[in-house]
Amino acid sequence: MAENLTKWGHPHTFVTQAFPDAFTSLEDTFDIIATDVPCSGEGMFRKDEQAREEWSPAAVISCAERQRDILTAVWPALKEGGFCVYSTCTFNREENEDLVIWACTTLGAELVEIPTDAAWHISGDTTGRNLPVYHFFPHRTEGEGLFLALLRKKTQDVGESLLGGDTFLSSKWEKTQGSRAAKGKKRGNTPSAKPNATLLSWLHNAEDFIFQCSEAGVWTAVPTAFVGIREQLAQVAPLLIGGIEIAEEKGKKLVPQHALAISISASDSAFPRVEISRELALAYLHREAITLPLEAPRGYVVLTYRGIALGFANNLGNRANNLYPNEWRLRNL
């Protein structure tokens, strides 16, 4: 996810890595939460032999319990009136229809109907209750199988029943929720720092950011409008992305970072842009050694293909250092 969102190039994105209960304390924070929950994987049976071998009725029960735990953990962080997308890649009612009914009776959620077209061949409730839920079966739609329901947080006390029935909280959640919260270490933020003119010139809208420099000398630009939510997230979970990583200090030099090259906030005039061929672009993305055209400027340049920024290279003349992230390189051409 961190790689994909960095490639997207939008500065207003943060990526964390934590258990769901890390977010319980962020009450009424998010407008939308998407929960692509772990499941028994019946939608993977056609293409994954291991998924078939690992399936059992006990696995379905265990997955449903985990799904309830996840929704219970993140529900307080959803704003009143906010939406929660619940999805699985399985077919059974225990993890799908029964689970969202549980969310309504226990969490005070309500199911929201999503407009669809009959031409899409999406199937509805399989339990005869006419619930506004959506099955994407592999014999009717493209893909291996998907279930989706849209939940809305009612503006009333959690636990009030909308569909009738008793409230439920799994014993597993009761045992682990408190212990994880107690053991969780608060993570502070890197203090804001004053960037020099060079750093400021690398963003076309630098006045919309604050700048932070880590102990390792990595400079990050954080959109001013999102500093508050970034600080909240950093207090409960490690941040894999917390803004645009724009430069790393190496001695007295500033080495531009890959995220800057592909950010929509990067200044087009900060670094020369060199358009390259398809063959050279593939070699670059494969992180091979490359040589740029003789007329290419020396130093750090942004390589582009069909006008789209691919990343940085340091052009030395007789060769160019390929600065594409090693962990992102194309494995197969």
Please provide the spans of the model-predicted regions:
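Class I S-adenosyl-L-methionine
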Residues: E113-T141
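Polybasic, low-complexity RNA-engagement segments
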Residues: E144, K154-L333
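S-adenosyl-L-methionine
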Residues: M1-D28, T35
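Residue-level signal for inorganic ion chemistry
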Residues: M1, I33, G82, A103, ...
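Mobile active-site "lid"/loop adjacent to the S-adenosyl-L-methionine
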Residues: D31-T72, C89-N96, A118-H121
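Conserved beta-strand signature within the Rossmann-like core of class I S-adenosyl-L-methionine
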Residues: F83-T88
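Conserved Class I S-adenosyl-L-methionine
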Residues: E97-A119
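Helix-to-beta-strand junctions that scaffold the AdoMet/dcAdoMet cofactor pocket
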Residues: L78-E80
